[in-house]
Amino acid sequence: MASVHGTTYELLRRQGIDTVFGNPGSNELPFLKDFPEDFRYILALQEACVVGIADGYAQASRKPAFINLHSAAGTGNAMGALSNAWNSHSPLIVTAGQQTRAMIGVEALLTNVDAANLPRPLVKWSYEPASAAEVPHAMSRAIHMASMAPQGPVYLSVPYDDWDKDADPQSHHLFDRHVSSSVRLNDQDLDILVKALNSASNPAIVLGPDVDAANANADCVMLAERLKAPVWVAPSAPRCPFPTRHPCFRGLMPAGIAAISQLLEGHDVVLVIGAPVFRYHQYDPGQYLKPGTRLISVTCDPLEAARAPMGDAIVADIGAMASALANLVEESSRQLPTAAPEPAKVDQDAGRLHPETVFDTLNDMAPENAIYLNESTSTTAQMWQRLNMRNPGSYYFCAAGGLGFALPAAIGVQLAEPERQVIAVIGDGSANYSISALWTAAQYNIPTIFVIMNNGTYGALRWFAGVLEAENVPGLDVPGIDFRALAKGYGVQALKADNLEQLKGSLQEALSAKGPVLIEVSTVSPVK
């Protein structure tokens, strides 16, 4: 009779999963033993890095990623990264080894007490099988739960003595199961949307990350061009759903209630696609919408639809809805919006570069299809203004604001997109949350470029301290970190740029390299 171990690997294989992202402990060794030759194991040195790498891989590949963590402690280390995955609808299958069944009740060392509850509410589904024979069925359920819209992480705890037990003899029925979450568009909803857009005198469009996840970017461009409507990206955007040099593009929305209502004032119909309404950040009280503005959102997530504080919501397949709207709305006789002017160059300070210059240089030198990961949070506005992001899957950011995402996620994105150059732009404060992911990049020779914006301070916190009128706050500076030394210690080539000439030379060298490169750039803080 087939074992749980062999049956589970065959299930993963038949479902198109051949990569395990992990950091093993003793509870995980029975699962990893006799590791199949047609699988690959991507090791990271800490669990937040494991989940970050897998998250990047899942988002870029648009496929579920399989993760193996160490019991409760490893799961706990991964929770911050899991919050980003939950908010980005990343299809992650997170497994964790559990103590042997005979020892769970006495809570022996490495017991995951109440395992199914540990990762909630950051997972769609969480479970520990009641018996060893049930493990393949639970794994199949996890795969399909993670993959169905809205996608998201799931969690499965497996006692380590289960792997050598006999599987249910009917587990083979699970191997080739296909579960579809396709939903036919509601004609009534479509009719309401099309009529609202056709009759609008001044419509506006707001796009979110699920547009990019659904690869619906081109349809949204067509929709904007037919409506001659301005397009904003929803606040706190973790992906880029629209070309940033398109005439209709108006940039990244602010993250305050009053600021958004002021921005949308005068637009009689606002269509939001693939974004929560809205992911606010700083407290900026005011009207959600000005009088005369009607908002309709299209989302794949019922939770997002239910919690929106205003407007109507339609839960639907993002790709299908974007395509239908693009083909059904009437061509407007309005003039196409005038493209926003490209920002002017910035004068340089001696010994340090302005962030604007770094982004201008990246924009000039990087390949047109480059992929950017951003965790230089104090310079996000400058990045959106200056990078010409043309293609789907060109930008990723921590969806829950949890730092430590970009460095490992860039490695996962590069694994999923080997033909495109991945460039992670990371603040010196952010980089330290997951710096050990550099080791993984070096060991697997993953040719990601890491640009560390070193200004010696938590710039985003300094900005927020001003918003909150919080003076004399300690712990906002992070001096004395040698990122080149850290990179070299993990086996990554490291370069330095204190001026524009050095930056250009370092980028040229990094773009020609066959492995990972870190460039430490001395920058001026945008916040004093």
Swiss-Prot record:
PROSITE patterns, alphabetized: TPP_ENZYMES
Q: Which residues bind Mg(2+)?
A: 117-118, 120
Biological process (GO) annotations held by this record are: mandelate catabolic process
- Which CDD domains does this UniProt record tie to the protein? TPP_BFDC (cd02002), TPP_PYR_POX_like (cd07035)
The record ties this protein, via SUPFAM superfamilies, to: DHS-like NAD/FAD-binding domain (SSF52467), Thiamin diphosphate-binding fold (THDP-binding) (SSF52518)
Q: Which cysteines are joined by disulfide bonds?
A: none
Give residues annotated as binding Ca(2+).
428, 455, 457
- Give the residue ranges for region: Thiamine pyrophosphate binding: 377-460
- Report the cofactors: Ca(2+); thiamine diphosphate; Mg(2+)
Q: Which reaction does it catalyse?
A: phenylglyoxylate + H(+) = benzaldehyde + CO2
Q: What is its EC number?
A: 4.1.1.7
Cofactor comment: Binds 1 Ca(2+) ion per subunit. Binds 1 thiamine pyrophosphate per subunit.
Q: Which residues cross the membrane?
A: none
Keywords annotated in UniProt: Aromatic hydrocarbons catabolism, Calcium, Decarboxylase, Lyase, Magnesium, Mandelate pathway, Metal-binding, Thiamine pyrophosphate
Segment forming the signal sequence:
none
Subunit structure and binding partners: Homotetramer.
Entry similarity comment: Belongs to the TPP enzyme family.
Q: State the name under which the record lists this protein.
A: Benzoylformate decarboxylase
Q: Which organism is it from?
A: Pseudomonas putida
